[in-house]
Amino acid sequence: MCTGGCAKCLGSTLIPLALFGILANILLFFPGGRVIDNNDHLSEEVWFFGGILGSGVLMIFPALVFLGLRNNDCCGCCGNESCGKRFAMFTSTIFAVIGFLGAGYSFVISAISINRGPKCLMDNSTWGYPFHDGDYLNDEALWSKCLKPEDVVPWNLTLFSILLVVGAIQMLLCVIQVVNGLLGTLCGDCQCCGCCGGDGPV
């Protein structure tokens, strides 16, 4: 597969992942699937917008760049047949790094939240974090420490786990594009587009 075609494939995969991450983050604002009375009762990590900013917005821009590489005009560099696509592929590596950082941000926030557990109403009628160092992950009986919102533990655990997996996949795809982009920069794409009058390798 040409480097441009590979980039398009990666971009096509990143777009739905980004939308999935945004949706998961939005759902975290409704713990247990319910509207909460006081926003202060939401887990702090929800407000870091890991899925909306990290896996979402910061990933959409690289994905669009990757999608555009398939039809990139090789004459885009002062009419030079060889450097147009090479420059575009090099630029894509920069966007891939940005995407990697965004996905990494979402991944870290999700991991911290999973380990910390959700903010909820505890037995002493105060709102806080009843779990420590992810102890609730191996002992479902501890979930009863959270009185309200109902089902907040499985809700947060599921959504942050989704964001964790999405972030990991996005980071992997961005690393692949960095390698793909460097190969495209050094070796060129499979062939030059017809506008230059050349059909051979870049």
Which stretches of residues belong to each language-model region?
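Residue-level signal for well-ordered alpha-helical segments
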Residues: 3, 34, 77, 84, ...
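Signature of small four-pass
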Residues: 2-123, 163-186, 191
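Individual transmembrane alpha-helix segments
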Residues: 144-168
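Non-transmembrane, juxtamembrane loop and terminal tail segments
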Residues: 193-202
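Extracellular/lumenal N-termini and interhelical loops of multi-pass eukaryotic membrane proteins
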Residues: 114-151
